[in-house]
Amino acid sequence: MVLVKAGALVDVVAGTVKKGQAILIENGVIKEVGPNLVAPAGTRIVDLSAKTVLPGLIDVHTHITSQPEDYYADRFRRSPIDIAVIAHVYAKRTLEAGFTTLRVVGADEYIDVALRNAIDKGKIPGPRLKVAGLAIGSTGGHADFTGFSPYLRFELFSGVADGVDAVRKLVRQNVKFGADVIKMIASAGVLSEEESVGAPQYSFEEMKAICDEAAMWGRKVAAHAHGTEAIKRAVAAGVASVEHGSLIDEEGIRMMKERGTYLVADVYNDDWILAEFAKMGYPEKILEKERKIGLLQRENFQKAVKAGVKQAYGTDAGVYPHGMNGKQFAHMVRWGMTPLQAIQSATVNAADLLGWTMVGAIAPGKYADLVAVDGDPLKDVTLLEKIPFVMKGGEVVVSR
């Protein structure tokens, strides 16, 4: 058994901070939480009495198997095998940053499934993963390889499907090969070469077919959706979360609030993209889309927060280097959240979106996934950018 002594503990469910708490852990699961716990003989003590302890953090929008280096080389010289042999490094780096659970929303060749399985079996270190396999998108859309010669073929990596029957089949294929969640491309994107970032890329009927098929297999759907109409189609079709949500309007906000749909807004990575992507050879068309949409996304995120739309923490990690996931907390606070709300988005809210009752809070029956910081993150949320203590399943990952 393990007893963790916490100087302060953030109860993300109650929204309070409790002083002088202890956490008793057995077989990687929290057994008891409270003051003055008596540890059985032989219990290992982890003294965090000078720190504030929080649940392990959750990022629900990551691409843990990739990280951009060069726009064209990434497409023409990097194979799925290259990606597979480096993905475990990104996973370890993210875990050490305090993110003990991730949702992976799209990966080539089901590499995310293999990574999840290896982590679950204890073969490599990494966060707990919920994975999507291939992102499902339309021909010529954000999930397709656009902007290249028609003589180049990318079918090997493709999640492209058109029409109700084809998208249903691809949902089934993803489930067959191990997907925990379904990722749907509802609108055009920023980091691809379509013309309009807001344009819908599936009809309502196709979106509804994806959501219905996923539900039949017990899977939730995450919708990549920047554009106003695409967001509303996706919400009406029954998605669990809208990813990005950059151009959401008042009607879309109302629909999401009424249906309890989560917004997953990656409000940090605009800074990184504009600072670094030109150096990596990204086309001007892509950079111009980012310049136009970054501020709009943050302003609309602020409106959604104010309106009470459910928020879950998702950063699009893999667009920027893995392990920097904590950078987004400060941006969320800058654009309308309290520090507590930002922390809840990365703990209890994210767990609710995932449908994973074993993560997201410090309570009996949950995995002993903990992080600790020096100071009070409810006063200075930037403390979560460099976390000195990480525990996953009762095992210390980082202590510095």
Regions found by a protein language model. Name each.
Residues N117-A135, V197-A223, G260, V264-V267:
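Alpha-helix-loop-beta-strand connector modules within alpha/beta enzyme cores
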Residues K51-K121, T139-A143, G147, E205, ...:
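Metal-associated gating/positioning segment near the N- to mid-region
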Residues I86-D112, P125-A135, A179-S192, K220, ...:
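Divalent metal-dependent hydrolysis catalytic cores, especially in the metallo-beta-lactamase
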Residues E155-A237:
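Metal-dependent enolase-superfamily TIM-barrel catalytic cores that perform enediolate-based chemistry
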Residues E69-Y72, S192-E194, I231-A237, V267-Y282, ...:
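Histidine/acidic-residue-rich catalytic or RNA/ligand-binding cores of hydrolases
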Residues T65-I83, K92-L95, T139-E155, G189-F204, ...:
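Active-site gating loops and adjacent loop-to-helix segments of metal-dependent hydrolytic enzymes
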